[in-house]
Amino acid sequence: MISRLACIPVALFALSGCAIHQNVKPVERFDSKVVCIVDNPSVRATFFDAYERALTNKGYEVKKLASGASLVECPVTSTYTATWRWDLAMYMAYADIVVYKNAKPAGKATYDASRGGGNMGKFIGAEKKITELVDQLFPRLAGS
């Protein structure tokens, strides 16, 4: 009986290693309908495309800035990074989107499946996950 009870914490600990974490601090309302995104050439181009599409669908106009551009080039600027891994198939293991208003942090979305282990949820399509993050990061339509 005691050995069975001892197995419970071990099982819970093992399962916690298969966790996918997502944390979003949404942006507050701002008047600008333009979001400038600083290009990150070390990330797959499909990430930028999905991010741009998700913002456009919410009514924002997207302006692409060159890699290394200053955060003060636009009133609302965003940076991003992401990594992919292989585990039976390619999947987006990590994504981080930061939004700045007047060069100060205004919102952030982080998705981390790098410790997803046997969790099959990590195989969600990158575009679907990016859209979900953008919908949570920008809860309102542009200008509302």
Give a label for each model feature.
Residues A54-I124, K128:
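Surface-exposed short loop/turn segments
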Residues I2-V10, S16-K64, A142-S144:
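A structural "domain/chain start" motif
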